[in-house]
Amino acid sequence: MLNVTTTPLQKPIDATNTGNSLQRQIIVILDFGSQYSELIARRIRETEVYSEVISYRTSAEQLRQLNPSGIILSGGPSSVYDDYAPACDPEIWNLGIPVLGVCYGMQLMVKQLGGTVERAKHAEYGKASIFIDDPTDLLTNVEEGSTMWMSHGDSCVHLPEGFEILAHTDNTPCAAIAHHGRQLYGVQFHPEVVHSQDGMALIRNFVYHICKCEPTWTTEAFVEEAIREIRARVGDQRVLLALSGGVDSSTLAFLLHQAIGDQLTCMFIDQGFMRKGEPERLVEIFDEQFHIPVAYINARDRFIDKLKGVTDPEEKRRLIGHEFIAVFEEESKRLGPFDYLAQGTLYPDVIESADTNVDPKTGERVAVKIKSHHNVGGLPEDLRFKLVEPLRKLFKDEVRKVAASIGLPEEIIRRHPFPGPGLAIRIIGEVTAERLNILRDADWVVRDEIKKQGVYSDFWQAFAVLLPIRSVGVMGDKRTYAHPVVLRMITSEDGMTADWARPPYELLETISNRMVNEVKGVNRVVYDITSKPPGTIEWE
């Protein structure tokens, strides 16, 4: 495994440890296992206030030291009466810090403070209209009858002393509650999800009016502080970055270059599975437009040789990853030595891969595991790097905002997500030079046409997949026996779930006509109408 420093978040490039205005206000989310915990943090940040997801096990004393402006208790899959139901430190209620419990978080608040939670007579899942009993404070500017997203089987039936009902639904008497004197609030619905009509109004009320936060978490402030922190951490040492061409690594390269200049070396390994024209365009943008030198490594023949005869998708991924490591090792030694490895780790990676619990012995928050970038995971032990991860506190949409603010071109900022193994896993079956050329040309038709028609940004992803079969066709009064191509176009907010796109038939027709006429070896185009779930975005 990659030998990196994993001390308790020691001087990471993040806004919570900088000692400036970015860290003075933070709202923390205690995570009880909700699928929406990350989304709550994103919604808070949309108000330009910093937010982090941390473990529900964090003690009241540790929260006191962190000194957040507010605390949110997430939802979760458990019932508060389950034998092993997760519970927070009950001293949290006595900190004098505003608390908002969401769904399970509200039920836990009620139970710990002496109220009663029972299995609901009528479980609520989906949209429900709320009727407001007290329009002040938390529910200011939330409309009567507003639609909110419900997902609960338990309900609060008796409130603790001092609490009052703020809103109800047809099936839930306590849809929103408050103890105004102690600034404790709860909602049975999920204001963070897009289906909740006035959810953001409620969140803004909690952030601005109840927690008294100011909008200081801005793109400009982050860029300024990130550059300062990179300089402070790296000093005069050298940094290596494996550039992929995506928005994350490109933004990271720009920030690092602004901070340390020629101490940065960007390495781009061309494994031969990129989209048409992308390797050349990447080097052109960085070399000519931004004057950031890129060490271009042409390893196409090595990678395709490794995949001869391989059809299993997991074996493809393994071999590509292994060969990338081999090339990376050789080239880093040739270009080095380096002290730091820069990675485009984002906040969702931190949430997924690092336990943000506190160490029971030291009281410090410890990263138990660092999730390596798909390109550099499993590097040999003798490559000893310290990590620098300036983007580790950002969500994807925040990275795009940073990229725009520092002047990266739209073609990078709005670039559709692309898998690490590239076109190799969009070719079902064996990868050959011939099949790569077919798919690369077919994929180019898709991208070129949606850009021409001005709808590129309407899709989360739009691409072609080459199947390991042939189909009969007729072209020029002659029988053909050629490849069918699958057209995959999807919409999504974050890639976690996705829906198949409903583009105009005229667009589908144009793409199909262009493919069979312009791409040698293709005589049929089919459209994938599978959402995620049950399918995945990629075919392999």
UniProtKB/Swiss-Prot annotation:
The keyword Nucleotide-binding applies. Keywords: ATP-binding, Glutamine amidotransferase, GMP biosynthesis, Ligase, Nucleotide-binding, Purine biosynthesis. Residues 217-415 form the GMPS ATP-PPase domain. InterPro entries: Class_I_gatase-like, GATASE, GMP_synth_C, GMP_synth_GATase, GMP_synthase, GMPS_ATP_PPase_dom, Rossmann-like_a/b/a_fold. One of its GO terms (cellular component) is cytosol. The keyword Ligase applies. ATP binds at residues 244-250. This is GMP synthase [glutamine-hydrolyzing].
